Design a protein with these regions (language model features):
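Short acidic/glycine- and proline-prone juxtamembrane loop motifs at membrane-interface regions
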Residues: 121-135
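Extracytoplasmic catalytic/substrate-binding loops of multi-pass membrane glycan-assembly enzymes
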Residues: 31-44, 54-66, 74-78
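Transmembrane-helix motifs of polytopic, lipid-linked glycan transferases
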Residues: 18, 82-103, 141, 145
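Short helix- or helix-capping micro-motifs
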Residues: 21, 112-120, 165, 169, ...
Length: 515
């Protein structure tokens, strides 16, 4: 009997999901070498060279995966962006599979997958290697297994949910919000009876086992993660008003997807067929309220919309029996694609930088603001996720020039010091080929693996105040100002500091910056 290749995957109901997912991944790979390394990518690369279960802000999963792929294939921009591109396609597949589990057909799966491909936030995270692309995917996967749990009533699936939650916590700590939201939603719905079985608790036990080594490390080091998130909430994050938060949800999800996910929310809360999955809607409502009142970053809630897109697509499919309705749905799908393509340069490195500036002066203003608000008092011409990929070579070349101006004897006793992990990451990534020592940096995870040179007698500092350095060194010389066109702050002061007035222990205490 001859074995025949099964072409069903290319022609069956799942085919449309596969095609959209492949197109999503390919698009990300095509632009993967545009611009340069993002500062968080360079930081994660540095963390990947010092793998540890302990962390201040980045848990070990993202650095470990980056270590694996760069060890195998190098650290080119294409390689760095390979996993985000693949996971972007995988996220499209998960949304499509949610539809399948909810009972949707080919039209619903195609519509939901298409919508997922053009969610602006997912377009953005798919073009960067940060923990966000993993976090978004893992949360979607958690909700997918939650749908399977509700549908099958197989409580053993709590074990899978627990494992996913544990991996999620070791990817990004904000997973705790989704775990807590789900736990509360189970408690206030009919599914509370699940707590009378052993399976949710065994799932929680699996999650605890996964995070236990990191938890022990945190306890032994004074919980630096608590210090970090406290500082992050107090100063760095934009504190959006309730109106701003809601508007950012609409824009971040693509304005034209608003009716789709609203129908999805109605479907899982009130629809005769969909209310079986009310737990999904209640979980979403709890998360929405928590993030609303805390002024959270708008993208934190975005992965929870995956299940709403799935529900909305099923709701739409139900009314697509007649040709006219199918034509209207086709028009709606085209609108999603067109607006997604128009918005894409706002979230992906597609346009040349000069053209990008022109884009923000014209089309970009239709879908957001020309100046993107990052921190509480900062206005910029380009979004931070773009400008922090640019002109790192300028900074490293300027530091190299200052370093090479020293005598060989002094260079041997010189540290390059900064409290900005982006600058430190650039020195580590590009400086080795120029003969620079590894950077010394007190910010976040860098504090635990970059203190080797802190006792050296000459410091080249990046971005420090000359007046402040004069208080702690005998001699401070302004060596150079590094100037950039797009990357902020635009001018960065490079100092040569000689004769430290402090001990190594005092330096270790002063340089620590968990924010």
């Amino acid at each position: 009997m001859k074995n025949k290749f099964n072409f069903k995957i290319f022609t069956g109901n799942l085919a449309i999901i596969i095609y959209i997912a492949l197109a999503t991944t390919i698009c990300h790979l095509i632009i993967s070498e545009n611009y340069g390394y993002f500062l968080d990518e360079m930081y994660t690369m540095a963390c990947s060279q010092h793998l540890s279960l302990g962390f201040v802000d980045i848990p070990p999963v993202a650095p470990a995966l980056l270590w694996l792929i760069t060890t195998l294939f190098g650290n080119s921009l294409f390689v760095i962006h390979l996993l985000p591109a693949l996971f972007s396609g995988a996220a499209v597949v998960v949304v499509g599979l949610m539809v399948k589990e909810l009972g949707g057909g080919r039209l619903a799966m195609g519509l939901a997958a298409l919508a997922a491909a053009f969610v602006p936030v997912w377009m953005a995270v798919g073009s960067l290697y940060t923990y966000d692309f993993l976090d978004q995917f893992i949360i979607m996967l958690l909700f997918y297994f939650l749908i399977k749990l509700i549908k099958s009533e197989n409580n053993k699936l709590w074990l899978a949910i627990g494992a996913i939650a544990g991996i999620g916590l070791m990817t990004k700590p904000s997973m705790i919000f989704f775990i807590a939201g789900l736990a509360l939603a189970v408690l206030v719905t009919k599914h509370r009876k699940m707590y009378a079985t052993r399976w949710p608790w065994m799932g929680a036990g699996i999650a605890l086992i996964i995070i236990l080594p990191a938890l022990i490390w945190q306890m032994g080091n004074g919980f630096p993660i608590v210090e970090y998130w406290g500082a992050y909430s107090a100063g760095k994050a934009v504190h959006a008003s309730a109106v701003e938060f809601v508007l950012m949800q609409v824009v971040g999800m693509n304005v034209f997807l608003l009716p789709l996910w609203l129908m999805g929310l109605y479907y899982v809360l009130f629809d005769k067929e969909g209310k079986k999955y009310r737990l999904l809607g209640v979980t979403f409502a709890i998360l929405f309220f928590v993030f609303l009142v805390t002024g959270a970053k708008m993208y934190m809630l975005i992965p929870a919309y995956a299940m709403l897109l799935a529900g909305g697509a099923i709701f739409v499919e139900r009314f697509a029996s007649k040709i006219i309705k199918k034509m209207l749905i086709a028009v709606y799908a085209c609108l999603i694609m067109i607006t997604g393509v128009i918005q894409a340069p706002n979230f992906m490195p597609i346009l040349p930088v000069d053209s990008l500036v022109q884009y923000y002066d014209t089309i970009g203003g239709l879908f957001g603001t020309k100046s993107i608000r990052l921190d509480n008092n900062t206005q910029v011409e380009l979004p931070q996720y773009f400008y922090d990929r640019l002109e790192w070579d300028v900074l490293v070349d300027d530091v190299t020039e200052v370093y090479n101006s020293l005598s060989g004897e002094e260079r041997a006793d010189t540290a390059i010091v900064t409290q900005n992990y982006g600058w430190a990451g650039a020195i580590d990534l590009f400086g080795a080929d120029k003969g620079l020592p590894k950077a010394t940096c007190g910010q976040l995870n860098y504090y635990f693996f970059s203190m080797e040179h802190i006792g050296r007698k000459t410091w080249i500092t990046i971005g420090e105040s000359q007046e402040e350095m004069q208080k702690v060194f005998d001699s401070v010389t302004a060596a150079k100002i590094s100037r950039t066109v797009y990357r902020k702050p635009g001018e960065t002061l490079i100092l040569i500091c000689r004769g430290p007035k402090f001990t190594v222990d005092e330096a270790l205490q002063a340089i620590k910056k968990f924010e």
